[in-house]
Amino acid sequence: MLEEVKGAQERANVPENSIETKAGDDRSMYVYVPASGCPDAKQTQVVMFLRDGADEASAQAAMKEYGLDALAEKEHFVLAFPNPRQSGWSERDAEDMDYLSRCFMALPQGKGKVGGFIGMIFYIGGSPSAGALLLAMSARRPLNVAGVLLSELPADYSIPQDGVNAPQVAYLCGGAARAADYFGKVNGVTGADARPLEHAVLYTSPVNPNVRHIVSELPFSAQEAVRAWDMLFCKARRWSNDTYGTYQKRTDFTARGFVAHVNDPGLGVNEGFAHTWYEYVPPRLRGSKEKAPLVFYFHGIGCVPLYGAEQSGWHDIADRENFIVVYPKPARNKAWNIWDEPGMPSDQAFVLALLEHMKRTYAIDESRVYISGFSMGGMMTNALACAYPELFAAAAPCNGFNSGYLVPASEMWTMLRKMPTGRGLPDGPSEPVTRTRVRADAKKAAFAYRMPLIQNSGLLDGTWPAAQDDPFKRLASFDYWKTYNNIPLTPYEPAAACESGLTADETFYDCADGRFLHHRWFSRDEGKPALFEVVLAKRMPHALDLRQLELAWQFMKRFSRGKDGSLHIDP
């Protein structure tokens, strides 16, 4: 189908899937949406094939010659054919690069009504000029290029010297093999990192095994397209969590043994609402009666559970550390009911019912149930931590703060209704004081609970140092958990040398590359345990770094919850 690509659109403001470009000319593209269907947009890959023609016949011919329609039907990706201008593709024309980004933005608004994930856009250069453009784009704008397949390069082409030298997944067919030295350089590989294949060599980065490129002796063909997909494209995802992103491996959920509950009314909660969640049990625990910890992970607004699984990698940590993971989906509109607003299904009741289901189904150590989440899922984590401290031993919210307690629903309602996920919301909240706050205050008044909490975020997510009037209440959230855990409040110093403006009992940089600014506060309780920590990633916007979850697990696993609500700490 022919789709318009408006030149005026410069930004797609979608949570965790935004892309920025520059305005340009109104152009068009042809799009093939597989009849077999696509997953949620944030789990959908997009393959863009650049050809020299600009008509439907040339798109159809390329699709059939290289078997791309059959591959799209099998693998459920969106196939796009951007149309070149009359002068053809030019690696010297920034408008062509901007236009390719606008093609991605145009997909959800088009006739196909299907989107993809910015970190899973793969490009195929079907001609020398297209290959030159894509090599220039991967060199200069790598964040928007998850992978490239180059079939040919112009005879007089010179590798860009003004690139940023970022790692890049790539497949080089015979006519583009002379770019091998460039990809070897940016991916940091040597001959020791090479593995011979039939008529090709696979190179794997010694720093990140998810960064790979293949140099093939063969010309581009349908068979080469399949090999590029099977060995590279289906395994690659570039998350926008650093200056030029980070490649992480994809998860084969079926092969890993995820247990899916899709639209399952069996929990008997929310008047029989059909809830969705996914369970993961490490192989060593399957069929075992040995009690194991349980981790809940709540994805961000506008996302889905399997996206959250790949984003967080909790199941990979579970394999090593022997715990069970559950990835729930909110009842409505991919947004968590963090306030427990009665005009909507109760996601908190859902989590409680799901916890009981997990205890009936598996051998769960009830004293070691932990919660974590990202963005609005981080808000959900905060809300559950204060509303149900008797059930959870520790919490690790990421990029979402205690808005469910600190921010009246009325303050966020207008914003939520404007978002794509806000369709069908009531006109406004039905109660002035949220049930989350009422429940949390009552629990704390009845017992001196402590809630160990490690808050993750990025130093490019919002403005740091944070303002006191921050609408998401970052500083107020920090002070809430300090007070909750009997930690003295410390002054906030926005002019301090520390990037965050936070003053803590301990401040240090984590990991060999100094990526994480780590703050730690100690309770005045006996033994002075560290019950509150904040970890901020340098160069990171609204995203996650897998190493933050590793730090979160090292923090949380030390804590367990007694039946009387008391907190126990391993030495």
Predicted regions: what they are:
Residues 1-46, 63-66, 74-78, 83, ...:
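A domain-start/cap signature at the N-terminus of enzymes
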Residues 44, 51-56, 292, 299-304, ...:
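Active-site glycine-rich loops that stabilize anionic/oxyanionic intermediates
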Residues 176-177, 460-465, 541-543:
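Acidic catalytic loop of the alpha/beta-hydrolase fold
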